[in-house]
Amino acid sequence: MVYEMLSPVPVKKRHRPTLVCLNCRRRKTKCDRGKPSCSNCLKLGETCVYSEDTDENASKKVRYEYMDDLGLPEFINMAPKGLHLLSKRSASWFNGLFSDIAICDRDPYLRITNAVIDILRKSASKGIDRSERDTVLQLPNSLKTVTMYNRSEKSEDQLYHQIAREFSALRSAPIPETYVPYEYEFWSKYYPYFVDKIHPLVPVFNLIELKDLLEKFFQRQKDHPGKLNDKVHESTLLMLTYLIINFFLLEFDSHNRLIQDHINIIKKWLVQSKWFQKTTLLQLRVWLVLRFHNWCTYHDNDGNRMNANDGLMGLIMGHCASLGITWQLWTNVDSDECKNIWINALHWDRKLAVLNGNDTFNGRTMRVPELPNDHLVLKFLKCCVDDPTHVNYKLAIEILNKLNFEEQNPMVTWEWKVIVAVTKLQINHGRLNHINEGISAVIASLEDLITLWNEHFIRPLAPVSYSSRIIEISMNKALVLLPAIILRARNPCKQKILQLMDKILTTYFNEFPYYYHVFKRLFKYKLTLNLINREDSLDHMLTILKHENHQVLEKLGITSKDAEMSDDDVIKVWNARFSFTEKVVNLKVEMMCKNYEPNLFSSSYQHALEKLEERHSAKADAIDVTQFLQQVFDSTDFDLFYGMDVGELPKMDSILP
């Protein structure tokens, strides 16, 4: 039987228009057919294309974004010793990837420097009688470490107890009673400044509605003086008036006692309120203003580790979620008022996460016109924070280079330039520790920072109380890692970087002496500069550690428990493991430094290192603390900075036996 090969019947294809967008069709997801963009594409930041919009093959017009070719990834270990959770009696805290402690932990040069500083500092405190309590000064609980020489914990704060009197005076008075500000002065002086300078940086209020609320508040206080009706949020409005007044005082009268009085009243009221249970839109706005205020003030700001307001930020982000102020505002709710609140909340969440190297409170993002860089910031944090031991260096730097804040407020644009520069400095420093090369990138990042510092001190952006804070933070980050650069460098580059560090220290302590966390770093940084300024500073420190704290060297793999090594052998082993051979490039940018008279940094602790090493080398069991402090404070000019006479300070004989 013969079978004929029949040609197949052609199948007629139906050409019907695709109703869903081509992106959803490709992803096989449900599409709501929204125009001009469906909700799925809006969330993902993609551009919708429908087949009915074009005669050509529309699938070719679906837009994709590709990362530039970065070549092979370069992974670095930014946390070779891990990240630590530290505790003391009053608090516990996690040190983020970009914290001062994390910077020091990943650099062997910084670890030995800090270890030697600790030895010298403890040598000075051996003669302190810890059974004798200090009854002279009355510092607040948050500053207990400075109140006595005799505390059981050893702290750097013991050595300059007396000069903290200014900080004691700020808070030693009892908390004042609430009061209503003078209305005419509020409207004529404080409120215009808030509208002109502060509100553009924290635009969470409708100014017309805000003015109406405050006018009604003052009128009710005239009708019923001394009574706060919380049914119409009078306590919240009173708190807002205190913050508005503080913004003006911080800029033009920063030593006014009213600033701290207002802070104490607000703290007391916050504890007594039910804000942890429920909130309103007005209260949430005031919290964001309080978050902004705490950044500006040197009284109760973010503290030494920039984490003092984490609880406040958690409260803000939590109540944003409870009120529906999240990313869904761009898909389901059309409220510009709520969007402004969410944008400002995200600004603080992202900024502090990048500065500390921590996770954000909200880990989602969308590509919306109001926040064009948010997805890049989160991508950078994911690259660095998810696994600090496996950071894609090239990708991290590439993302930082892509950040563009030119369309933002000029202050926000400038601030993020500083944040990006200081973050690059730390990423490049992490690479330097990982592969023991790349110091030119560290120097280039430092030059970018110096340029921004010079701009600030020539023509600071107002409000200065706000712009100064990021300068203080970035200067401290540079000061933390500069000793590692100096110890790696050789003459003449070493001397030039030492001169740079001296200029930064001089500017840092003379421009920001009233931040408590700055003030208490003074003694340590003075010792550090004098120590690394020695010609044989590295050998000198290794010798001290070999005799006094060999555990530090053992953790670095330098010494052995089974065999004693000579001082020269320790130095040879160090050079074999950590010696830096790359040539250090010269700085191309000059740090501008004013001629400060008096100079707080140069005039303090003149003989501190000499006296400490003298006592340490003598291996005395105890030291004369009175004599030591007389040497330390011999030529200080704190009376001009803190409005007090050093001669009137409590005598050591009245504190120590």
From Swiss-Prot:
- SMART domains for this protein: GAL4 (SM00066)
Q: Which residues cross the membrane?
A: none
Location (main, coarse): cytoplasm
Cross-referenced InterPro entries: OAF3, Zn2-C6_fun-type_DNA-bd_sf, Zn2Cys6_DnaBD
Q: Is Isomerase one of the keywords? A: no
Name the UniProt key words of this record, in alphabetical order.
Cytoplasm, DNA-binding, Metal-binding, Mitochondrion, Nucleus, Repressor, Transcription, Transcription regulation, Zinc
**Which is a Gene Ontology cellular component entry for this protein?**
nucleus
Q: Name one GO biological process term.
A: positive regulation of transcription by RNA polymerase II
Q: Name one Pfam family in it.
A: Zn_clus
Give the family per the record: Belongs to the OAF3 family.
Q: What does this protein do?
A: Transcriptional inhibitor with a significantly increased number of target genes in response to oleate.
Q: What is this protein called?
A: Oleate activated transcription factor 3
